[in-house]
Structures are given as structure tokens and as C-alpha cells.
Design a protein with these regions (language model features):
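Glycine-rich FAD pyrophosphate-binding loop
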Residues: 12, 21-44
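Beta1/beta-strand and adjacent pyrophosphate-binding region of the FAD-binding site
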Residues: 2-15
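Predominantly flavin-linked oxidoreductase catalytic cores and closely associated redox partners
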Residues: 106-239
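FAD/FMN-dependent oxidoreductases across multiple families
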Residues: 217-288, 292-299
Length: 363
């Protein structure tokens, strides 16, 4: 680099790319580091709420141009019970490949320098260290490494979760007319003992099935677990009948759902999953990524590096309500004794589902 940048952004997912867009449009010299050489289809984040779509629009990305599937309703399945409720506003199902590509292109167009294949591994004395031994320095660093752990920044979930950690799984299901008819314009949540599965159709017509399951339930190969779940839960089994098992199942270990932290040092802005990891059934992971980026950019413009601690405290405070509610629903949903009553309540009081959908957004 010929001149020292004003800021380094680690990670070119929605949080990092969103921050790079805002910073670069404000005239800052930005270096955006991305560990992968090509944009991939990340495991999490296929659901974009109405609020997330509005944040994308503020960055100049029209949700309609992403070509996603319109999502108008949410379905719950628990045992023999089910519910279906209209969402407060229309959402979208879109692949992370499509979303991340659009955000990265916007960041480059805004003037950010995107450097691919650079794996940042640690922060020491305000400098970013990379796997190949390089050291990059800037007055401010925006840490947006997603769900990947980052050396020196442990993310410890609650004690009960540490005893039985959560694994994230994802199965891509090819487009099929019968599956389209089954799922339609819904995002589905299939609740089961010690876990849940979320299903939504995406931009290319495929369906994204993501699971959060405790390690004690995994008991072996992910495919074997999915097949058992399909046998035990007929509605999920109907969907899994369209699976192409040759595609393989993506996995990420020890996801610290429910963790959040409001502590940082001057010059370090922690974004997205590096600030807090909301249970994925809330469908707000991408919302938090973009909202944290927006808030960090605003704070930086007013106070540069020194604004980081205040930004982090304020972001953690904003996370309090949606995280508490999402954690409660998660615990109820993965417990067989409470999942069915929860679903019955959703069927009897759809207004409560819509209220919860709004309350789990980051205000």
C-alpha cells in the first residue's frame, strides 16, 4: 500500500462491505480485507427482513435487483402442530453469494480497495496481522469476520450452551416445482428436540435449509441426523425428499448464539457477529450486520478512532431486547415440552407472531 489507509475493514461480508461503502462514500481511504479469493455462498443469512431491505436501499442496493424470492409468511412446525402467519411486511430469500457480491461491488464502486485472499489472523498494537506474516496498520480497524473466531477476541456463550455447544448445518436443495408449492412464499421453522431447521427459497429457485443443533443431538454424520429428522418429523421429511445428498452438507462448529459484548478499545469497531450473535431463528443476522455497520460509520465520522467504545456500548444496548426475546423463543422451540404449546399459541394469536417479528429486529 502506497499510503496508510484511514481504516482497515476485516471481512467483506454484509457487515464489512456495508461499513466500507459508508466510509468510502464519506471520502475515507479504506482497505477491505477478505480471506476468500472468490465470493462464496456463506452458510448463514438467506433471509432479509423488510427492515434489512430498507438498510440495503439506503446503501443504494434495491432489493428487487437481487432477484430474491418474496417471503410474506412464517410457518412453524412442532410435532403434529403447525401455524402460519403473515409477516408484518414482505421479506426476501436470497443467497449470500448474490447479496455479498452486490455489497462488495458497491464497496469497490465507492472507492474501497478490496484485497482478496488476505487472511487476517490477529490484532496487535493496532496493526492487523495476516497469515502470510504481513502487518497492516491504520488508525481504525473494523472487525467484521463473521462467525469465524478471531484470535484475542473470545466469544463465550452462556454456561448452559458451553456444556452442549451448537453446530450450524446447511443443506442446499435444488429447485423442484413440488418443493416450490410446499414452501411457497413462506419462511419455515421446523422445531425439534435440541434444535431447529429453517427453510426458505432463494434467488435461483433453490431452497436453503439451515439447522442449529446441539452437539449432543448430532451423534455422528450430519446426513444421518437429517435423515433421522426427516423420518421423525413428516413435514420436514416431505421437504427433505427433494434433497440432493450428493451436494454435501456445510457445517460450522460452536456457534455462540446469544453472545454479545459492549467492550472494545479506541480504534476498534466490532461489527455483526463479532459484536453479537443472535439466534438464527430470529432472521436478524443480516439486519444486525448492516445496522452495526451503519452505526459504526456514523460514530467514526463524528469521532474517528476515539468513538469506538461509545459505539460498542450503544450497539450492545440496542441488542438487549431482540437478543433476549430470540433467546427465549429458541429455548422454548428446542424443548419438546414447550415447542408444541409455542406453536399452538402462534396459531391462536397471529398478532403475537407479528409483534415478535418486529420486536426481534434491531431498532
Amino acid at each position: 500500500m502506497s499510503t496508510r489507509p484511514d481504516a482497515i475493514v476485516i471481512g467483506a461480508g454484509p457487515a464489512g462491505a456495508g461499513a466500507a461503502i459508508g466510509l468510502a462514500r464519506g471520502g475515507a481511504k479504506i482497505v477491505l480485507l477478505e480471506r476468500s479469493r472468490e465470493t462464496g455462498d456463506a452458510l448463514c443469512g438467506g433471509f432479509l427482513s423488510w427492515q434489512t431491505l430498507a438498510r440495503l436501499a439506503a446503501l443504494g442496493i434495491d432489493g428487487a435487483t437481487l432477484g430474491g424470492q418474496v417471503v410474506r409468511r412464517v410457518r412453524l412446525f412442532a410435532g403434529a402442530r403447525s401455524s402460519e402467519t403473515m409477516l408484518p411486511e414482505a421479506a426476501t430469500g436470497v443467497s449470500r453469494l448474490r447479496l455479498d457480491s452486490a455489497l462488495q461491488a458497491a464497496a469497490v464502486a465507492a472507492g474501497a480497495g478490496l484485497e482478496r485472499g488476505v487472511h487476517a489472523t490477529a490484532l496487535e498494537g493496532g496493526a492487523v496481522q495476516t497469515r502470510d506474516g504481513a502487518e497492516l496498520a491504520a488508525p481504525s480497524v473494523f472487525l467484521a469476520a463473521g462467525k469465524h473466531g478471531f484470535r484475542g477476541f473470545p466469544r463465550e456463550p452462556a454456561a448452559w450452551q458451553r456444556e452442549d455447544p451448537v453446530i450450524g448445518l446447511r443443506l442446499r436443495m435444488p429447485q423442484a416445482a413440488a418443493l416450490d408449492r410446499l414452501v411457497g412464499d413462506a419462511v419455515e421453522l421446523h422445531l425439534f428436540d435440541r434444535g431447529y431447521a429453517g427453510l426458505v427459497r432463494q434467488d435461483d429457485g433453490s431452497a436453503n435449509l439451515c439447522l442449529a443443533v446441539h452437539k449432543s443431538r448430532l451423534g455422528g454424520a450430519p446426513e444421518a441426523l437429517l435423515r433421522r429428522l426427516g423420518d421423525d418429523h413428516p413435514r420436514l421429511g416431505e421437504r427433505l425428499a427433494f434433497a440432493d445428498w450428493s451436494r454435501g452438507i456445510d457445517a460450522i462448529g460452536h456457534v455462540p448464539y446469544g453472545w454479545r459484548d459492549g467492550v472494545t478499545t479506541p480504534g476498534l469497531f466490532r461489527l455483526g457477529d463479532q459484536a453479537g450473535v443472535i439466534p438464527s431463528l430470529a432472521g436478524e443476522g443480516m439486519g444486525i450486520a448492516l445496522a452495526s455497520a451503519e452505526a459504526a460509520v456514523t460514530a467514526w465520522r463524528h469521532g474517528t478512532a476515539g468513538a469506538a467504545p461509545g459505539f460498542q456500548r450503544a450497539l450492545a444496548a440496542r441488542m438487549t431486547r431482540p437478543f433476549a426475546l430470540a433467546n427465549l423463543i429458541w429455548r422454548l422451540g428446542e424443548n419438546p415440552r414447550t415447542a408444541s404449546p409455542l406453536t399452538a399459541c402462534a396459531a391462536a394469536a397471529p398478532w403475537l407472531v407479528r409483534l415478535t417479528s418486529r420486536a426481534t429486529r434491531l431498532g
